[in-house]
Amino acid sequence: MTGPLTTAEIREKFLSFFESKGHLRLPSHSLIAPDPTTLFTVAGMQPFKPQFMGAPAKFPGYGENRRVTTAQKCIRVGDIENVGRTRRHLSLFEMMGNFSFGDYFKREAILWAWEFLTSPEWLGMDPARMYVTIYEDDNEAFGYWTQDVGLPEDHIHRFGADENFWPADAPAKGPNGPCGPCSEIYYDRGPHYGDDTWADYAQTRESARFLEVWNLVFPQYDRQDGGVLADLPFKNIDTGMGLERVASVVQDVPDFYSNDVFRPLVEKVAELSGKPYEGEVSVSHRVVAEHIRSVAMTIADGVALSNTGRGYVIRKILRRASRHAYLLGLHEPTLYRLVPLVVQAMGGAYPELVTEEARVTAAIRAEEERFLKTLESGMQRLSGLLEGMERGAVLPGEEAFLLYDTYGFPLDLTKEIAEEYGISVNEAEYAESLERAQETARAASKYGKSELFGGSQEALEGLPPTQFVGYDELEAQGEVLALVGAGERLDHLMAGSEATVVLSRTPFYAEGGGEVGDTGVLEWEGGRGLVRDTRKTPAGIWLHDVLVEEGELTPGVTVRGVVSSERQAIQRHHTATHLLHAALRAVLGPGVRQAGSLVAPERLRFDFTHGAALTADELGQVERLVSRWVTANFPVTWREMPLAEAKAAGATALFGEKYGDTVRVVRVEGGIPFGDATVTSMELCGGAHVTRTGDIGAFVIVSDENVAAGVRRIEALAGEAATAWVRAQLNNVHRVSGLLNTSPDTLETRVIGLQSQLRAAQQETAQARRQLAEAQMGGASTQQVRELGGFKVAVLRLSGIEGGELRGAADKLLDQSGADLAVIASDKGLVVKASKTAVARGAHAGQLIGKLAAAGGGKGGGRPDMAQAGIGNPEAALAALDTAF
C-alpha cells in the first residue's frame, strides 16, 4: 500500500479516479430520502432511481452524464442494537459508488475497480491479497477476472443467487423487475486477523481476516413471471464501496472505531468520562462516538428531533448515546461537546455541518437536558418496582423493556440497579420484547430492490402524467383514464362506491409541499361524485379519491371537475405561510429554516428551526410584518425558470428537497421596510396562492410552541378563519368580564387583584396547617421512638396534614427525636425521612415506604433519605413497621 491515507484522502481519490474515467462527480444527497417509501437515504444508488428506471441522466446545476460517481452519506437503523456491541456495525456510513445508466457495463466496472484498488497511483493494495466472489452462472464476470485482470482461479468463489444476486434469490423468489448478478471484492488482512483460509470463508461466510471492500452489481435482467430472466434493453452498473470499511484496510486498523475519524471521538469520550477505552465499558465509548456522528449529520441535513418519523428515529439514536454516556458516569449534558470533532472530521466533505454547527450543538444539548430529566423519572419508576419486591425475586423482562423503551434505560443499567436490591432480571423475556420492537423497526426501514425499481404500481402502468390546470382554472374537463380499487383496475364504479380516479386533465391540486389536496365534485352525464382528496405519484399521475353519489362512472367518460370553495381559504393560508416564513427570517435571523408545514382551509401550521420561545415582542413584530404585506395589497406572481436562475435570484428553497431542472417560483411583488433592510418573499413552490396579498384579508398568530429540540411551531389563521377567531376571543373577554363584574378595559386589573387575594388565602391555609401539625406533634416525640431493625424510628400519626407540611413535619420530628428515621402517617399520606448516618448504615427510605404503603393500600417510592407515598389506611401502614425491617 502507499501509506496510511486519511479517510478524507481515500474519499477524494475515489471520486477523482472516476472523474478521470469520464464520470460526473455529484455531491451527496441529503440523508432525507428522495423516495417517499423510506425515511432516510439508505443506499448510494437510491437518489438515482429515476435514472435506473430510464429517466434522462440530467442533474440540475451539474450537467448531463450517463456516468456518475458519488460518496453518499447513508443511514440504516434496522440493527441499531448491534452498533457499538460489534466493531463493524454503523448506523451512519459513507457509500462510495460509480454508476452507469445504460453506458458501460461489466468489463469496465471490473477493470476500473481493480485499477483503483491495486494501482500505486490510487490505493495500492497488494494484488496477491485480493479475492472475489461471483454468481455461479456468471461466466462473463469470471472471464474478466481471470483473463483481463489476471486473478488466479483459486481466488474466486462462485455462489448461488442467495449470495451473489441482487435482490437476493430474485430468480426463484422475485420480485419481478430489473435484477442481476453481483461480484464482491475481498481483501486478505493477514494471519494476525485470523488463521482461516479463503476456502474456510467460502464455507462459513464469517471472517475477521477476509473483509469485503466493494460490491459490483450488474442489473442486466428483467425478472418476469415464472422466474424468466429476460435481457434488459439497456444495462446499468451500480457499485458500492463502504468508506469506513476500506479505510480500516488502508490504515491497517482492526476495526472502524480505530480509523482517523472515530479514534479522536473515542479518545474524547474517554477523556470526558475518565474511563479508558478498554474492556466491557468500551461498548459505551463506541456507541457514543458512532451515534453523535449520525445525529449531528442528520440534524445538519434538516431533520428535527420529534416524536414521529425521521425525528423520532434520530431522537432514539441520540437517547441511546445519552444512555451509554450515563453508564460512563456522564450525568450532565456532554454529547454536544463532541460536535466540533464531528465537524472537524466531516465538514470538509459536508459543508452543511460547518454552517449548521451552532444549531446542531444547541439541538443536541437541549435534547440531552430533556432526556436526563426523563432518565431521572425512569429511576423513580424502577425504584418503585424494586421496592415492592422481595430479595431474590425476578423483575419481569417486559417491565425491563418498558423502562428501556419509555425512559431509555439500557438493560445493563436496569440489571445494575436491580442487583443492589438483590433482584435479577428475566433477560429472556426482555430479549423477546426487544426482538418484537426490532422487527417493527426493520419493517419500517426496509429498503429492497423491488422498492428501488417499482413493482407495486401495476394498476397505474401505462398511464400518462396528468395535465394539471388548477393554478389558473377551478373548473376543467378531463377524460377518465382509469378507475383503481384495492390495487386493481376497475371497469366501472356504481353509486355508493369509492375508488381512485385518474383523469387526463384536472383542476384539483394534489397534496404536496405542506398543502392539503383539493376536494370538490366530478360531474358527468347522468352522474356525480365527491372528490374527497387528491394525491399524486412520483411519476406525475394525479389520484382522485372519489365517492360516486349518483349514476355509474366508467373509463373513457368525460367529466367536469369543480374544485371546492375551500381552495380559496387554502390559497390564503399558503400565501400567508410564505409571508410568515419571510417575517420570521427578518425578525429572528437568517438561521431560521422551515422544518415542516401544513396548509389547510381552516389554518396554517409552520415548523421552523429556532432555539428559544419567541418573546411577545418578537411575535408582535412577525405578525405586524405579515399584516403590513396584507394591507399593501402587492401582486403575487409565479413563473417557471431554471433552478440555477432561481437560486441566483435569491429564491428560498426547502432544505433537502430535490428539485428538477425547471422550478416554479412564487414571488410577492413588493417588500416591507424593516430596520435597515427591506423584507421580500420569493420561494420555490408548487402550491396554490392568492393573486394579491390583500386577498388574505386578515392574519393572526394563535400559538407558538416547542415541538422538538431546536424546533418551534407557529399556528396562524388567515382570512375568515382569522376574523372568526378574533371575534371568539372578544366574546370570551366580554363573558369573563361579566362574570367578574368588571369591564373589558379593567379586566386585567381585576384578575391581578383576585390572584393576590388567592395567594394570601393560600399562605394563610399553609400557615394554619403548619400550626396544626406542630400542635399535634406536641412535645412527646421521645415517647414515639421505637427500636426496629437496629435503627431508632420515630413514629407519629397526624390528621389533616398533607404535601409539603407533611415533609416539614418529618424533618422536625427527626431533629427533635434524635432518631435514625422518622415515619409520619396522615389521613391520605405517608412520609419517611432518614438521617445521613442511617443512610450510611444501609437505611433506605424509598424501600421502607414501598412496604408500608403496600400495607396501607397505596404505593410510593423515593430516595434513600426521603420518600413519600399516598395511602388509604394509615393505621395499617404504621402497623406494618414491625415486619418491614
UniProtKB/Swiss-Prot annotation:
Its main location: cytoplasm. It is an enzyme of class 6 (ligase). The keyword RNA-binding applies. Its EC number is 6.1.1.7. GO terms for molecular function: alanine-tRNA ligase activity; aminoacyl-tRNA deacylase activity; ATP binding; tRNA binding; zinc ion binding. SUPFAM superfamilies: Class II aaRS and biotin synthetases (SSF55681), Putative anticodon-binding domain of alanyl-tRNA synthetase (AlaRS) (SSF101353), ThrRS/AlaRS common domain (SSF55186), Translation proteins (SSF50447). Disulfide bonds: none annotated. It catalyses: tRNA(Ala) + L-alanine + ATP = L-alanyl-tRNA(Ala) + AMP + diphosphate. One of its GO terms (cellular component) is cytosol. GO terms for biological process: alanyl-tRNA aminoacylation. The keyword Coiled coil does not apply. PANTHER family: ALANINE--TRNA LIGASE, CYTOPLASMIC, ALANYL-TRNA SYNTHETASE. Consists of three domains; the N-terminal catalytic domain, the editing domain and the C-terminal C-Ala domain. The editing domain removes incorrectly charged amino acids, while the C-Ala domain, along with tRNA(Ala), serves as a bridge to cooperatively bring together the editing and aminoacylation centers thus stimulating deacylation of misacylated tRNAs. This is Alanine--tRNA ligase.
